[in-house]
Amino acid sequence: MSENGLEQEVTVEEKNNDVTEKILVEGEKSKEYEETPRKVKIVKRKKQPARKQIETRPEYEMEPEQPGQVYNLWYNKWSGGMRQDPLKSQVKSETRCVISRDSGYTKADKNPGSFFCLYFARGMCSEGSKCEYLHRLPKDTDFFNANVDCFGREKHADYRDDMGGVGSFLRQNYTLYVGGITPTDDIEEIVSRHFAEWGDIERIRVLNSRGIAFITYLNEANAQFAKEAMAHQSLDHDECLNVRWATTDPNPASQARNQRRLEERAANAVKKLLPKQFLLDLEETKNGKSGNRKRKLELEFGLKGYVPSDDLLYADGANSVHNQLAANEFPNKSQSEEGSNDDHKSVTTTESQNKFVNSQILSDLQVAKQAVHTNQSALVSYYDSDED
């Protein structure tokens, strides 16, 4: 594309779900064919808008047919009267979510703290990019209150008897129970391939003879998303899966592993909030090198026995102690080569901008440290008789 003697080149790079456009603009060439430096303008935008999975949403979410006499609001079914096996009455879902094809940006991306679209997880959202909920997979940075799931549905104090539904807010459950799998020799590979689409998996335990699998995710939100996405779906043999929450494993080794995982998650969350220098100091203290750190601080400040407070030592940005000391030691290498007068001015300017470590204060403290304490004379003098 050329306009007014300018040439424009557009380069598109794809990375994750974002597209980076690099626009290279060449200046007007002179008669001597001297080229000016090209300007690079980087424009980042989302890869694609969310896709409409279906045209119109089926209105099947109505009250079920009345096979009994009393309607139970908690279980959303009728009780009494006719009895039927709930596992045999399950119907395979006609829609399924495909992350690589259906995910994209929606109106919810502009609102921090938005929930995920339940119909998107089930593969039946008809809103597309106009949806007010997120159309993507949950990430580690997505946090929600303990009383709601990633779709915004309220949790209950206890699980249902069939371990279905939203779940309980008294326990963080990362494990799904998947039944109705066709027993094969490669059942573990099939389960891993289908369920790895919804997030990072920590471990998979498969019972080949019974067609049952227990899948543990690293993130609870991914487990919630996978439960809704794989409910009434099939793997490779046209079966209808029964996806439920897993009960507590009575194995002591499993309980210890869950406790260790919770402690690691809490430690990682705290580490992200602490300064890097503070983490390095903790590591040195753990290895028995706290004395070296104290001596290093004394040498940096030039004051024996002086250790700054944690608020001063671990301040972030340009106000940190280490940045202030580095500014005092290396004000400007390029100006130091030109002349000593310019160096003196740059050091003075840097010291005047120092908020925490002032050179005048340090010099006064060093003078006070070197002061010699003389013995004071007594108030009453005593004379010996020999002196007379």
From Swiss-Prot:
Record's comment describing the protein's domains: The C-terminal RRM domain and the zinc finger motif are necessary for RNA-binding.
GO molecular function: pre-mRNA binding; U6 snRNA binding; zinc ion binding
Coiled-coil intervals, chain numbering: none
Assembly: Belongs to the 40S cdc5-associated complex (or cwf complex), a spliceosome sub-complex reminiscent of a late-stage spliceosome composed of the U2, U5 and U6 snRNAs and at least brr2, cdc5, cwf2/prp3, cwf3/syf1, cwf4/syf3, cwf5/ecm2, spp42/cwf6, cwf7/spf27, cwf8, cwf9, cwf10, cwf11, cwf12, prp45/cwf13, cwf14, cwf15, cwf16, cwf17, cwf18, cwf19, cwf20, cwf21, cwf22, cwf23, cwf24, cwf25, cwf26, cyp7/cwf27, cwf28, cwf29/ist3, lea1, msl1, prp5/cwf1, prp10, prp12/sap130, prp17, prp22, sap61, sap62, sap114, sap145, slu7, smb1, smd1, smd3, smf1, smg1 and syf2.
Record flagged with keyword Nucleotide-binding: no
Zinc finger regions, C3H1-type: 111-138
Source organism of the structure: Schizosaccharomyces pombe (strain 972 / ATCC 24843) (Fission yeast)
GO BP annotations listed: mRNA cis splicing, via spliceosome; spliceosomal snRNP assembly
Region (Disordered): 43-63, 331-352
Function: Involved in the first step of pre-mRNA splicing. Required for cell growth and cell cycle control. Plays a role in the levels of the U1, U4, U5 and U6 snRNAs and the maintenance of the U4/U6 snRNA complex. May provide the link between the 'nineteen complex' NTC spliceosome protein complex and the spliceosome through the U6 snRNA. Associates predominantly with U6 snRNAs in assembled active spliceosomes. Binds directly to the internal stem-loop (ISL) domain of the U6 snRNA and to the pre-mRNA intron near the 5' splice site during the activation and catalytic phases of the spliceosome cycle.
Protein name in UniProt: Pre-mRNA-splicing factor cwf2
Similarity section: Belongs to the RRM CWC2 family.
Cell compartments where the protein resides: Nucleus
One Gene Ontology cellular component annotation held by this UniProt entry: U2-type catalytic step 2 spliceosome
Keyword Phosphoprotein attributed: no
Source organism superkingdom: Eukaryota
Assigned keywords, A-Z: Cell cycle, Metal-binding, mRNA processing, mRNA splicing, Nucleus, RNA-binding, Spliceosome, Zinc, Zinc-finger
Domain RRM: 174-248
UniProt gene name: cwf2
